[in-house]
Amino acid sequence: MGDEDIAALVVDNGSGMCKAGFAGDDAPRAVFPSIVGRPRHQGVMVGMGQKDSYVGDEAQSKRGILTLKYPIEHGIVTNWDDMEKIWHHTFYNELRVAPEEHPVLLTEAPLNPKANREKMTQIMFETFNSPAMYVAIQAVLSLYASGRTTGIVLDSGDGVSHTVPIYEGYALPHAIMRLDLAGRDLTDYLMKILTERGYSFTTTAEREIVRDIKEKLCYVALDFEQEMTTAASSSSLEKSYELPDGQVITIGNERFRCPEAMFQPSFLGMESSGIHETSYNSIMKCDVDIRKDLYANIVLSGGTTMFPGIADRMQKEVTALAPPTMKIKVIAPPERKYSVWIGGSILASLSTFQQMWISKQEYDESGPSIVHRKCF
C-alpha cells in the first residue's frame, strides 16, 4: 500500500514493547518500550527542557533520573492516562500521522475484560478522533501471520503468556489458558539468581541491563538436569557480559536456569503448570475431533519464545504428554517477535476486512459497546 495518506495504522500494544506501523507493510516502522517515565526529583534536569513525562526510547535513555512505569501489566492496560500518552507518542512522534485521518487496528490480550475494549474504543474515537477502528485478539493475528487459520498459539510476551486454540479463524474462548509468567518475570528471576552470584541489580534502570543479558545470553536446555551436570563439571557453558561501566560479569548455569522457569514455574514459587502442560491442557479442552489439527500446528509467538532451544524442548515435552501416535509439530517462525503486528498488517489490508471496521458514525450512534458486536 504505497498511499500512506489513507493506509490503516496497526498498533500492537504489548506489556513490554509497542509495535506500530502501516497496514500492508511487512514489518512495524516503530518499535519502542511501553514505558512512561517521570523525573524522580523535580528540578534536577535544569537546562534539559524539563518535561513532566517521557515516553518510550527517550524514557529509556534518561532512565537514570526517571521513575519508569509500564501502563500495560500482564497484557492488560491498567493505567489509561499513561496509555493515552503512549498512543499520542505513537501517532505524533513515531509514525508522524494525524490519527483523525487513518483507520486504526489495535490489538488486545485474549480474555481482555469487556470494559477495557470499550475504553480503548472510546479513547480512539473521542480523544484521537479516529475515522474508524477495530480491536483484534493478538494470538489470532499471530496465527494469520503464519499462514494458518487453525492451530494453537503459544503467545508469550513480556507481561503474560496465553495458549489460544483457534479453529477456522475463531479463538475458542473456553479453551484459552492464561499464564501470568512471561519475559518480565524471567528478567526478575535472572536479577535474583545473579544476586546469588554476588552481582547486585535492583533499580528499574538496572533491570533493563539484566533484560539485555537475558536476550543475548539465555537459552532453553533440551534436558535441564543434564545441562546442570555439564555446567557444574566444566566452564564450557560460561559466557561473559560487559556492563555499561566496563565491569565484566560471567554467567554460567543462569543462562538456561532463567528460561527454564517457563517449563517449571515452581522456580519462581508459582504453582501453575509450565507452558508445555498449559498448551496440552488447552488442547484437551477442545473437541476431540480438532485436537489432531492443533497438535500438528503449535505456533510460537512473542518475544519470550525467542530463546534458542525453546521449540525443540516444547516438541519434546508435548510429545511426552500427547497420545503416542500423535503427530506433533511446533512452528517457530523467525519473525515471531512481531507476528502479532504482521498479522494485523495482513488483516487490515484485506479487501474483505474493509466492511469490518467500526466507523465513527456507528460509534456516535451506539457508544463504546459497539466493539462487542463488531470485534470478535
Curated annotation (Swiss-Prot):
Highest taxon listed in the record's lineage: Eukaryota
UniProt-annotated location(s): Cytoplasm, Cytoskeleton
Keyword set, alphabetical order: ATP-binding, Cytoplasm, Cytoskeleton, Hydrolase, Nucleotide-binding
One MF annotation (Gene Ontology) recorded for this entry: ATP binding
Gene Ontology cellular component annotations, sorted alphabetically: cytoplasm; cytoskeleton
EC number: 3.6.4.-
InterPro entries according to UniProt: Actin, Actin/actin-like_CS, Actin_CS, ATPase_NBD
Xref: SMART domains: ACTIN
Pfam families: Actin (PF00022)
Reaction(s) catalysed by this chain's protein: ATP + H2O = ADP + phosphate + H(+)
Alphabetical list of SUPFAM superfamilies matching this protein: Actin-like ATPase domain
Role, per record: Actins are highly conserved proteins that are involved in various types of cell motility and are ubiquitously expressed in all eukaryotic cells.
UniProt record similarity statement: Belongs to the actin family.
Protein name: Actin
